[in-house]
Structures are given as C-alpha cells and as structure tokens.
Amino acid sequence: MAYTLGVVVGILVTIAAMILIACAIFKLGNKDGRVKTEYDERQKIVIGEGYKFAFWTLAALLVVLQIAVEVESDFGDTSIIQSSLGPLTFALIIVSILVFCVYSIWHGAYWGINNNKRDYIIILAVIGIVNLILGAVAIMRSGLVIDGALSGAFVNLMCGVLMVVVLGAAWIKDMIDKNRDDEEGDE
C-alpha cells in the first residue's frame, strides 16, 4: 500500500502534536511543573512488581488468544477472532495495563510524589469520557462489528473502560485508606 507524501506528513504531524499535548498534560498534572513523575524508593519497587504482573498477564492472555485462533482455524471458521486480531490484541494490552494500574494503586505507588492527584483524576476522567463518547458514537453510526470484525469503536470503548476502572480503583483505595485513618484516629 503506497502512501502519498501528504498522508505521511499528516501522520507525522499528528504524532508530534500528540507528544506535545501529552507533555503539556504531564506538566499540568505535576506540582513542580516537570514532565517526569518522581517516585520514592518503595514506589519504584512496587512499580517494578506491577510491571512484572502486567507482563505475565499479557503473556498468558496472548497464549489464550493464540489457542483461540488455532481452534477457530481447525474448525474452518476464520470469522471474528482472526479478522479482529488488532482490536483483540489491543484489548489484551489494555487488560495488562489495568493489572499494572490497579496493583500500583492498591500498593500506594500509582501517584508520584510530585503529582497533583486531583488534576490527574480530572485528566483521566476527561480521557475516559471522551473515549466512551467516541466509541458510543461510532457504534451508533456503524456498529461494533463491521463485516465480521470488531470495529475501531471497540478500541475507544476499551480505553474508556480502562480509565473508569482505574478511577474506580483509586476511589475505592481512597475510601479504604480514609476509613483506616479514621479508625486509627479514634484509638
């Protein structure tokens, strides 16, 4: 498939713009105005463990996906799984990211020491809502499955669900910590 120079330039400009927007968001979300989030030593250890669990989750899910592809091929039906490998693989990546995020939240390592937690919650909520809206609009226009394959709307929905679950896990963890602090304060 040959691309024209205009398409290539458009893709590169879009990537550059997204990088700049991401840097601006990180700067806004950190108390010190830096792009990089800082973590203490305990948080770094927890983050490493979270990455390990996320990696093994992804590896196991990819094995399951490969088995499903083989089983589907053996039955001569190459419909939804093989024609949707891109969105399904992306979904597995989202699940592994979710494992990392929830593990980090649960062990107090998700928010860096220089993060403005409230700003990050707002950013995550906006990203989640935008993705859910984009996914819902695309599904209303074209459907979730097009010509036997999952549509791009599936990816938006997965990103939106990721943000909702991360925010839900953060809220639950905050409630547990608040109750624990209240109980310790009463003693």
Q: What is the role of each PLM region?
A:
Residues 69-103, 151-167:
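Hydrophobic alpha-helical transmembrane segments and immediately flanking/interface helices
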Residues 108-129, 184-186:
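Membrane-helix boundary/juxtamembrane motif in polytopic membrane proteins
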Residues 41-49, 79, 109-118:
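Membrane-interface helix-boundary motifs at transmembrane edges
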Residues 139-155:
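Extracellular/periplasmic helix-loop-helix junctions in multi-pass membrane proteins
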